[in-house]
Amino acid sequence: MAQAMLFRLNLRLRAQNKPPFSVEADSLRIPDSALCVAAGQLLTSVSEPWLVNHCLRTFLWATILGKKEHRTYDEELLFVGSALHDLGLTDVGAKLSTGRAECFAVEGAFAAEAFLAQHGVADKRRELIAEAISLHLNVRVPLKHGVEAHLLHAGAGLDVVGARYRELAASIRDEVVHLHPRIEMKNNLVALMKQQSRARPLSRAAFLCSHGFISMIRHSAFAS
């Protein structure tokens, strides 16, 4: 047991001694396939500016962390999942999903799947995106659910509560926020989560809020 403890301690120390990860600023781009453009148009047409920027930053954080972890992933799937992962928080998302879920993440997954079906996306790809969106509120999303789901969760977690914030160089963190400003993200998201908790007391949002999620948002390393 002592050897195992020393091994884990050594891994932590090695991780702490690694320099923060970064990428070239010109690699921070939004993919421009027809499906990505359509997803981006849907996002901007139904979401407030702060939520649009959150979804775009989620994608960029996800791609940066994917490079850090040396992951191979489908860029189009990851972008569409990131762009639409909070669709359940919008009026259009609720209509597309036909109100079938108690949780906004699951409702967003239904809505995204309906949007993808309208654009002729194959069943398997629709299912991968829908599952990634449905799972993004979980505490952890292991790789067994797909690299895209794992990275979407990581990107959203970084943007919302600052998870893995210090793993990235300050320069690249600043560049992402410069490209897509936070626009009072903390205050806006806290208000929205409280609203979700009241409207859907059995949802994951309500569960998370009852277990310190609001405080985690407010005390993340981001300024706003």
PLM feature spans:
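Divalent metal-dependent catalytic cores for phosphoryl transfer on phosphate-bearing substrates
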Residues: 77-179
